[in-house]
Structures are given as C-alpha cells and as structure tokens.
A protein has these predicted regions:
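Membrane-interfacial amphipathic/re-entrant helices at transmembrane-helix boundaries
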Residues: 1-32, 61, 72-75, 101-106, ...
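Membrane-embedded helix boundary and interhelical linker motif in transport proteins
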Residues: 21, 43-89, 93
C-alpha cells in the first residue's frame, strides 16, 4: 500500500490524471442507474434491489445485438424500448402488488426478482464474463501514462445527453409533471385527476429503460456477468442514500465522488477494495445521518 501511495503521489503524480478521468467516466454511468433508483424510490417508495440486474440485462441486450452484427451504440434505442416494456411487465406482475405494503415487502419482492433475473441470465448466457467490442481506438497522453479509451468519452457524452433529456422530460412534459406531483403527494395528485397507477407504471418502466442505457455503456466499457448486478445495486444505493431523493445534482456529484473513491481505493489497496469502498461510503453516510438525527432529537428535547 505504501509503495502504491509513493508511486501515485511522488514517483508518477501524473497517474492522478488517469484516476480523475476514470472516476468521471465511471461516475457518469453510475449516475444514470442511481437516478433511476432515486426516481422509483422517491415516487413509489420502492427500494428496487434488482436495480443492478436491470443494468446487467441492458448489457446483455447490447451483447445479443452485437452477435447479429449491430454496433452496440446503435443497439441503444432497441435496448431502451425492450427494457421499457420489460419494466411495464414487472410493474404489473410484481411491483403493483407491493407499493402500498410495508417497506420490507418491497425489499423482499425485488430481492426475489433479482435472484430470478440472475438465474435466467445465467441459463441463457452462462456464467462466463462477457464483453462488447466497440472498435474505438485508445488515445494516450503524458508518454503513455494516461490512456483515454474513446468509448469512455463517447459513453460520457451519451450519459450526459440522456440525463439532460430526462431532466427536460420531467420538467416540460405532462407525464413528467404528473410524476413530480405524485412524488410530492399521491393523494393530492389523485384529487387533481392524475392516474397514479399509470404514473407508477411509467416511472418503473422509465427506470428500467434508464438502466438499459447504463447497461449498454457498462458492456462497452467493462465486462458483464449474470451475477454482477449486486455490485451496481450497492453502488446505486450508496449514491442515492448519500445524495438524497429528488436531488439530481447531488446524485451526479456523488456518482463522481464514488467513482474517484473506487479508483483510488483500487490503485492504493488493490482492486478487491473497490466495491468495499462503495460499501464503506454507504456505511459512513448512514452513520453520519444517524448522528445528525440524534443531535436534532436532543435539540428538540
């Protein structure tokens, strides 16, 4: 660990540029999946433990399309549409039945959904790690110390464009306004004539489509495997818990922070500590909020 610290900050400080860039590229993808989770959590009060599995499904959708000769970027709209329909089906079969129940019911339901999706993907694609070749070149800087795969740059642009489109949709469209109204007060939304069931169905389907986009980007940048979903679920929960519901700038900022934390944890302590870093961030945020809550209670008393 000390040798890695010395390498990072003394012998080759230019490697920090690599860490910062990778954190940005990773954070952009995390932000998409995390925003989808924040949307479902904030509007429907459903903690979707299958969030990461939706991401992996999107990745396997791109992988399947490449097998028939379609470039993964051109597979994006197809994967979005398929995942949107899939989200509607899951809502009708599973989520609709647990919305008004206790929080633990939704946790158990989505946990069961996660296990089911993992096994289905395992049966179809096998347990092997898969990747999608995007055929983009890799740029180098600082005499090769910093590498910038162009697919990561393109993924950053696509993630930013998609996030911008979602924000515009939520602010300008009638459905977006209905979603925001339902998130604030479902009963008042019903009084105003908003079909909250339709809003819930659309919200969950939109979340699935967002995860599908994130999954395509993940497949092009890293690797996918049927049981990797839990990794992305942990990350999205850490981001949303830290940023708060309905806070898109906070989700984006926390996604970048988590991306940087993972990169530095990996280079300093080893790759096996990257996911552990996300878990420690989650534990730290929960502990800090518990301390703040206790202080507020003491002030009230």
């Amino acid at each position: 660990m000390l040798d890695n610290l010395q390498l990072l900050f003394v012998l080759a400080p230019v490697m920090n540029v690599q860490m910062i860039l990778d954190g940005i590229f990773i954070g952009a993808v995390f932000a998409l999946a995390a925003y989808g989770l924040a949307l479902v959590w904030g509007v429907m009060n459903v903690k979707n433990l299958a969030q990461g599995d939706f991401v992996i499904m999107g990745g396997f959708g791109a992988y399947t399309m490449t097998k028939v000769g379609v470039h993964p970027i051109f597979a994006l709209p197809v994967v979005m549409a398929v995942m949107f329909v899939f989200g509607l089906i899951v809502y009708r079969l599973v989520i609709k039945r647990v919305i008004d129940n206790d929080m633990f019911v939704s946790l158990l339901a989505t946990f069961g959904l996660s296990l089911f999706l993992q096994q289905v993907m395992n049966l179809i694609y096998g347990p092997e790690v898969q990747t999608v070749d995007s055929h983009f070149h890799i740029a180098t800087m600082f005499d090769g110390f910093v590498t910038v795969p162009m697919i990561k740059v393109i993924s950053l642009i696509l993630a930013g464009a998609f996030a911008t489109a979602i924000v515009i949709f939520m602010k300008k469209s009638r459905m977006g306004q209905a979603i925001r109204a339902t998130a604030q007060d479902p009963r008042a939304a019903r009084v105003l004539g908003i079909d909250t069931d339709k809003v819930y169905a659309f919200t969950y389907a939109l979340n699935a489509a967002i995860c599908g986009v994130a999954g395509v980007l993940v497949a092009m940048i890293w690797v996918i495997q049927p049981f990797y979903g839990i990794v992305y679920s942990l990350r999205t929960f850490a981001i949303v818990t830290a940023a708060g519901l309905g806070n898109l700038p906070g989700v984006i900022g926390m996604s970048f922070i988590l991306g940087w934390v993972e990169q530095y944890a990996g280079i300093i302590a080893g790759a096996e500590w990257q996911i552990a870093a996300a878990v420690m961030v989650l534990i730290g945020v929960l502990s800090w909020r518990q301390i703040q809550l206790r202080r507020q209670r003491q002030v009230v008393r």
